[in-house]
């Protein structure tokens, strides 16, 4: 256990805003008995700092070797720049669920999340990332929008949702709609294994920089991850497990 005063930056954060987010989460989470009481308390205060300090306990985390340093990954909502129409600048499609994608429990789709497509009388695994990218004229693929950066589109798929600022000035929210059934593979592992980026320095920014230094290899590296994510237009920003908007 540690006092909140030992958490660097805790009291510098906007804890009143954090309290408002907590209240919204309580609309769903208060159904859990262990959270019902604290959710009720939250409705009767606007003092975020006092609320969290009075109702929660901070703990310091250690790994199995008693080290107190480690890596915690977090979600971020990507912002891409795009257009509803394909242009010379905006040429990378953000696809909807393909028209030919099917769900089936046939043996041929074992290991592919039961996701495939019908070819003749057979149901086969759905196309890999490389195959999808090589066939932009596929009539089964329809774009929600087009964006100007292939690498940013890749990381939009990794995150599963994000925002596209259109050339009209409007913001388009896109959310996860489905996937091609292929296994996700981290391209970060490629950079670490090939000693291009150290394990300690790996990040989205570091990966982008490394890709841009080797433009001729971008497609080959991105295609290491055969998984391809499809999107839908969303009414709001990204939601979490409680189906409330992440902030």
Q: How should these model regions be labeled?
A:
Residues 237:
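Conserved helix-loop functional segments at active or binding sites
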Residues 241-247:
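Hydrophobic alpha-helical bundle architecture
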Residues 2-234, 242:
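Secretory/export targeting leaders with adjacent low-complexity proregions
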């Amino acid at each position: 256990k540690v006092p909140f005063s030992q958490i660097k930056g805790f009291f510098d954060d906007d804890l009143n805003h954090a309290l408002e987010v907590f209240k919204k989460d309580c609309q769903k989470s208060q159904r859990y008995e262990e959270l019902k009481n604290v959710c009720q308390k939250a409705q009767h205060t606007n003092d975020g700092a006092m609320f969290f300090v009075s109702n929660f306990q901070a703990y310091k985390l250690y790994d199995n070797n008693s080290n107190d340093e480690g890596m915690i990954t977090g979600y971020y909502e990507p912002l891409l720049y795009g257009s509803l129409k394909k242009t010379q600048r905006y040429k990378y499609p953000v696809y909807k669920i393909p028209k030919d994608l099917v769900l089936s429990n046939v043996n041929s789709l074992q290991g592919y999340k039961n996701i495939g497509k019908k070819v003749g009388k057979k149901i086969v695994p759905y196309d890999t990332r490389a195959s999808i990218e090589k066939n932009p004229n596929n009539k089964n693929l329809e774009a929600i929008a087009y964006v100007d950066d292939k690498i940013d589109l890749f990381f939009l798929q990794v995150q599963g949702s994000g925002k596209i600022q259109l050339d009209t000035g409007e913001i388009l929210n896109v959310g996860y709609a489905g996937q091609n059934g292929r296994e996700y593979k981290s391209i970060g592992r490629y950079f670490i294994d090939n000693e291009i980026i150290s394990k300690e320095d790996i990040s989205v920014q570091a990966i982008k920089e490394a890709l841009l230094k080797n433009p001729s290899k971008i497609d080959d590296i991105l295609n290491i991850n055969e998984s391809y994510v499809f999107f839908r237009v969303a009414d709001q920003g990204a939601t979490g497990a409680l189906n409330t908007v992440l902030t």
